[in-house]
């Protein structure tokens, strides 16, 4: 059964359009509240958000929904997604909600939900909440004397900074390191520079002037060109770029070269194996991770388990198998020993830990493997259109897979967070260009028809 409101990473869409309306946020608060209010006593939910203007509207609607069914609400204000997950667990809340559209532009927004363990809800829970949203919610309203209360938590950012610092070895400091950190004008704009500075680094912050409209605008992990320039300009040792909600990271070495999540996974897997912290000879990533990573890991006797795209699915596989390292090429790095969900800042600190242990420059360590030639294109489609169900598109994909043979890979998937179809091919350079062009053309023809 397909989902109506939830995608691969919560509910997401353009503000004031389905499903991201104030009415749906209100109904989600009421429905999720009913789902988690299953026994007597007080119940609570924590809410954080990034820096989008629409966050105020969505937050107000959620608060009204939760309090109407008897849940107390703790409001954090701007705070990274992983902080909300951690604080859900720390405050013994029934539920956590992060208001964000992650790496999307300001005009989009979304709602990510976390259970009491700080982990994202599974498909079953999301489907049950959707059913409640579409039903009558009147029966779940609290009596006037049992309404929930809303309270702002002023020290949430300071609490998270302490949690982040505790993930870094106490005997190690970042003294003598100059770091440029790009916070994408997003949720990490205060906490990321603060944590790095308190650990002793010389911090040059950029992307720390949010105005409600500039989140992810030519900055952050999806647009690292500025970070690269600033690293070279200030002769920094490392550049760190977060996305709008702080759950993913890409890096930049001292020469300005961008390092993606696959390279970070390769570095950490090898280092953790060497020091005995890799619990199993395997890590988890998605179908989008580069073939070069898989080959590098195989050379070290480490298996790469692939899942569908989405850090939630990576986390689920890790829980099933007991694997303690996983992530995505986009920069979600999942380390359950430190955080129940992807945390860009903690991942960056793990890389800095390796740099400190090795005494080497970032450029010497962070090109772990030679990536296989890869081409990824996003084909925009009108909302509601499903070109991948077209026989013409299916035929184009089948023909492309035959042409790729066993020497390459082709992945075609609809995004769960944006109205695009992603077409990714790996293999010989000229072949993947031709294959992607053909598949893209078939999708565009159907989408525009």
From Swiss-Prot:
Cofactor: how bound: Binds 1 Mg(2+) ion per subunit.
EC numbers on record: 5.4.2.10
Enzymatic class: isomerase
Family: Belongs to the phosphohexose mutase family.
Keywords: Isomerase, Magnesium, Metal-binding, Phosphoprotein
UniProt keyword Cell wall biogenesis/degradation present: no
Name of the protein in question: Phosphoglucosamine mutase
Organism of provenance: Maricaulis maris (strain MCS10)
GO biological process assignments: carbohydrate metabolic process; peptidoglycan biosynthetic process; UDP-N-acetylglucosamine biosynthetic process
Annotated gene: glmM
Pfam families: PGM_PMM_I, PGM_PMM_II, PGM_PMM_III, PGM_PMM_IV
Disulfide bonds: none
Catalytic site positions: 102
Positions bearing Phosphoserine: 102
Post-translational changes noted in the entry: Activated by phosphorylation.
Catalytic activities: alpha-D-glucosamine 1-phosphate = D-glucosamine 6-phosphate
Source species taxonomy: Bacteria, Pseudomonadati, Pseudomonadota, Alphaproteobacteria, Maricaulales
Gene Ontology MF terms: magnesium ion binding; phosphoglucosamine mutase activity; phosphomannomutase activity
Function: Catalyzes the conversion of glucosamine-6-phosphate to glucosamine-1-phosphate.
InterPro entries tied to this protein: A-D-PHexomutase_a/b/a-I, A-D-PHexomutase_a/b/a-I/II/III, A-D-PHexomutase_a/b/a-II, A-D-PHexomutase_a/b/a-III, A-D-PHexomutase_C, A-D-PHexomutase_C_sf, A-D-PHexomutase_CS, Alpha-D-phosphohexomutase_SF
Residues where Mg(2+) binds: 102, 243, 245, 247
Cofactor(s) it depends on: Mg(2+)
PROSITE patterns, per the entry: PGM_PMM
GO CC aspect terms: cytosol
